[in-house]
A protein has these predicted regions:
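Active-site acidic/histidine proton-transfer and metal-coordination neighborhood
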Residues: 2-7, 74-75, 79-80, 92-210, ...
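Glycine-rich, proline-tolerant flexible connector loops at the mouths of alpha/beta enzymes
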Residues: 53-73, 132, 138
């Protein structure tokens, strides 16, 4: 399959997806429903599904596998869009990584982050993302929140200093917020908290850091992902984006993009187009445990086709009409116009 491309998009026009998107179907209540696809073979599956970029954790493509992974990616015609250290899978991080009360664990997390940056460079990744997986608490007063902020500031300052010394200023680091799951309460729970944290970093490091918002994570927090993305854009900090769908404030469902809120998704794409977003548009989705192995890439192709359809509809939205509705204070009419653009 030829790679999907977003017509008239500035910068990167291809799409990305994670190797974890096509996993074995496990969930907290049940084991695998499919045999695992070898990790390097997943690169070919994603390429065949029309992806231009793959994403991976350091537990999926190990540091010592990076050169071989890049070679395999070149062979199948896909590039590394994003690489991320796992601060959540190893039991040592069960009560946090950079915010752990144990200084030895905090030091280990920082070393893992540094190694992930080196690995990302070998892979040719466009951005390194840090997700707050275990940063937070389940019971009150088990951590001092003020100390947690200081630890995050110190940790990311150390990571930035290492990145600049080793690789120079041409590297992008993004933080991905999420409000809960797996922890009951998570630090860096939303875009605003991440932007605040970046503002607390040393001034010489702030330009290296941005945000990787995920639409479902905003919804889990009861927030509007359109506004979250607009905050990132206004701050010049939208370094990456993860698209998916979420059916209310439940567990993180990673449903196909365009499934639950297509009108809001249409509006989001209008915002990205008008802002001239140049980064990769990627999916954080998950093949459901009910899907047959031979159809495991459906989650990727369905999301991609929904995105391309909505992208074309967003290009056709009359921006002058939007402005007229605003000027005339016809908010309901504007909503109706967008619905017409969506449904025809």
């Amino acid at each position: 399959m030829n790679p999907y491309q977003l017509r008239e998009k500035k910068g990167k026009t291809g799409l990305g997806a994670g190797v974890w998107n096509i996993g074995v179907g496990t969930d907290p209540f049940g084991g695998p429903t499919r045999e695992p696809i070898p990790m390097f073979d997943r690169l070919a599956v994603l390429a065949d599904a029309g992806m231009s970029y793959f994403e991976a954790h350091d537990t999926e493509i190990l540091a010592e596998q990076a050169e071989a992974a890049r070679k395999r990616a070149d062979e199948v015609g896909i590039r590394c869009g994003m690489y991320t250290p796992s601060f959540f899978a190893d039991p040592v991080f069960k009560d946090g990584a950079m915010t752990s009360n144990d200084p030895a664990i905090r030091a280990l997390a920082i070393e893992n982050a540094k190694r992930a940056i080196d690995t990302a460079r070998v892979l040719g990744a466009e951005v390194v993302v840090f997700w707050n997986g275990r940063e937070g608490f389940d019971f009150v007063l088990t951590k001092n929140g003020r100390d947690a902020v200081k630890r995050l500031v110190d940790g990311f300052n150390q990571v930035a200093a290492y990145a600049k010394e080793k690789h120079g200023d041409n590297i992008r680091l993004a933080i991905e917020p999420k409000p809960n799951e797996p922890r009951a309460n998570m630090y860096l729970a939303n875009v605003g908290e991440v932007l605040y944290l970046i503002s607390r970093l040393d001034q010489s490091h702030r330009h290296l850091f941005g945000v990787n918002p995920e639409t479902a994570h905003s919804r889990i927090a009861g927030l509007d992902y359109l506004w979250d993305v607009e905050m990132c854009l206004e701050a010049g900090k939208l370094f990456h984006i993860h698209l998916n769908s979420q059916d209310g404030q439940r567990y993180d469902q990673d449903l196909p993009f365009g499934y639950t809120e297509p009108l809001k998704d249409l509006a989001l794409l209008v915002v990205l187009q008008d802002a001239g977003y140049e980064g990769i548009v990627a999916f954080d989705i998950k093949a459901p445990r009910t899907d047959d192995p031979k159809n495991i890439a459906d989650i990727v192709t369905v999301s991609s086709r929904n995105l391309l359809s909505l992208w074309e509809k967003a290009l056709a939205v009359d921006r002058d009409a939007i402005q007229r509705f605003r000027d005339e204070k016809r908010n309901t009419a504007l909503a109706g116009y967008l619905a017409q653009c969506l449904y025809g």
